[in-house]
Amino acid sequence: KIQIIENGPRGVAFKVTQRDGKSTFNNIIALSSGGQCVEIYSETEWQSLCTLAKEQFCFNANNDTATFDLALGAIKRKNMSEKLYEVPAQNWVDLTDKSGKYGISVISECKYGWDKFDNSTLRMTVLHTPKYNYRIDSMQSMMDLGLNRYSYAIFSHEGEVGADTQL
C-alpha cells in the first residue's frame, strides 16, 4: 500500500506499507524542498523467526568496488563472494560509478552490516532473528522481535567519494 502523506512547498513524503508473513514494514520516504538527500524512516513490527531482512538499493552507478566507512577511515571492498558475504560499515557506504563522475551514498546511524551484491547493488542488514541460541543465556533466537525503528538516507554526489560527498 502506498499513501501520499505530504505534497507541498516543504517537500514530498509518502508511506509504503508491506507485509511479509507476520511482519509489517512501514517506510516513510521523504524529500525536502531543496534537500540534498532522500530520507527513509522505517518502523517494522518484526515477527519473523529464523530470518534475516535487508534493505536493497539498486543504482545506476556501476562499479565492482564500493567504499565502506570505518569511523576512523574508509575501506574499498569488491563485490561479495562465497567467503565474504557481509562486511561492517559505521555510518555510510558509497558506490561511485567507475567513470568517477558521480556516486551514491547510503547513510545510516544505526545499521552496520552490509553487502555489495553486484556492480550496482548495495544491501543493508536491518533485522535478524537467528535460528539458534549460540550461548545458552543469549536469547539470540528472540533478537529483533517486536517493534524496530531506524532511519537512513540516500545521497547522490558528483565526482569521487570524499569528505565533501558525505553529509
Place the predicted regions along the sequence by residue.
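C-terminal (or distal) subdomains of carbohydrate-active enzymes
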Residues: K1-L167
